[in-house]
């Protein structure tokens, strides 16, 4: 067992086949596994693969991705983790994924490193979205054989972090509950001069969003109305954070309105999306944080 690398997986009503496959892959790659469960509707302990080698933390209610990750981080650090890697419940990794990331970090003295992502359905690379200090976004398109590069942000799944980063930057922001958690934390790292190393030779299959629709050339992720609430509200909360570029925060507020308008125009439960957007806007302006109205 590689005792200094811990994997933190946050679950919420997971598809057991995918989750168990990920756990098996991590165990085969000599990684300790910590599962933090956000109130799954069935007893997870009896259904996990190799449960005696998995540390399962069951929360009494949905505490959100940020708090669940923090609980997993603290447990891992208490057990002596030197590096922590995060995964979604439906993530899948290839052979030597953990070893390659860890070796790269050691060889290049990188504090944070992550893979590139391949769309599960369309089999193309997702571009990496780099956010500059002035708030402008830059899409970095990944090509086969590309050399490693640095980015200000990445998604949490598949990202490996050295323990000292948490000592310098702090934990995930529990005020945000779910959306923008990884973006805000990465921008906090950027504020301390810590960038994410992206390694194109290390790949991970990923699916973003429940589904999406393409309107006027724009891919709009279609989440539930409640999930849209957090997306919209948190865009306003970003305006309150000094390390988040103002231009980025304004962009997210504007785009949240555009996206909601397009979702209302194309989806059946229009009234529910409209209500959630109005409530999210009001709560965001008032500074309502955490799970707010809907954590249970």
Curated annotation (Swiss-Prot):
GO terms for molecular function: glycosyltransferase activity. NCBIfam families: rhamnosyltran. The gene is rfbF. The keyword Lyase does not apply. Its EC number is 2.4.-.-. CDD domains: GT2_RfbF_like. Belongs to the glycosyltransferase 2 family. InterPro entries: Glyco_trans_2-like, Nucleotide-diphossugar_trans, RhaTrfase. This is dTDP-rhamnosyl transferase RfbF. It comes from the Bacteria. Keywords: Glycosyltransferase, Lipopolysaccharide biosynthesis, Transferase. GO terms for biological process: lipopolysaccharide biosynthetic process. The keyword Glycosyltransferase applies. Pathway: Bacterial outer membrane biogenesis; lipopolysaccharide biosynthesis.
């Amino acid at each position: 067992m590689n005792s200094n690398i811990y994997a933190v997986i946050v679950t919420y009503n997971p598809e057991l086949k995918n989750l168990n496959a990920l756990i098996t892959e991590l165990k085969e790659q000599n990684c300790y596994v910590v599962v933090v469960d956000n109130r799954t509707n069935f007893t997870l302990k009896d259904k996990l693969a190799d449960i005696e080698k998995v540390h399962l933390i069951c929360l009494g209610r949905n505490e959100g991705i940020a708090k669940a990750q923090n609980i997993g981080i603290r447990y891992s650090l208490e057990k002596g983790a030197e590096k922590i890697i995060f995964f979604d419940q439906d993530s899948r990794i290839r052979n030597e994924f953990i070893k390659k990331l860890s070796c790269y970090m050691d060889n290049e003295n990188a504090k944070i490193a992550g893979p590139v992502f391949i769309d599960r359905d369309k089999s193309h690379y997702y571009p990496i979205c780099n956010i500059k200090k002035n708030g402008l976004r830059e899409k970095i398109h990944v090509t086969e054989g590309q050399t490693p590069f640095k980015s200000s942000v990445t998604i949490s799944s598949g990202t490996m972090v050295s323990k000292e980063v948490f000592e310098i930057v702090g934990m995930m922001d529990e005020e945000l509950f779910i959306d923008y958690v990884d973006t805000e934390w990465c921008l906090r790292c950027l504020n301390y001069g810590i960038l994410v190393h992206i390694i194109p030779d290390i790949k991970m299959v990923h699916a973003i969003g429940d589904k999406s629709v393409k309107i006027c050339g724009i891919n709009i992720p279609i989440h539930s109305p409640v999930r849209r609430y957090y997306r919209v509200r948190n865009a306003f909360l970003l305006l309150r954070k000094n390390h988040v570029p103002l231009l980025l925060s304004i962009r997210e507020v504007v785009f949240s309105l555009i996206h909601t308008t397009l979702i209302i125009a194309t989806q059946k439960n229009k009234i529910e999306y409209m209500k959630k957007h109005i409530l999210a806007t009001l709560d965001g302006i008032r500074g309502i944080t955490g799970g707010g109205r809907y954590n249970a």
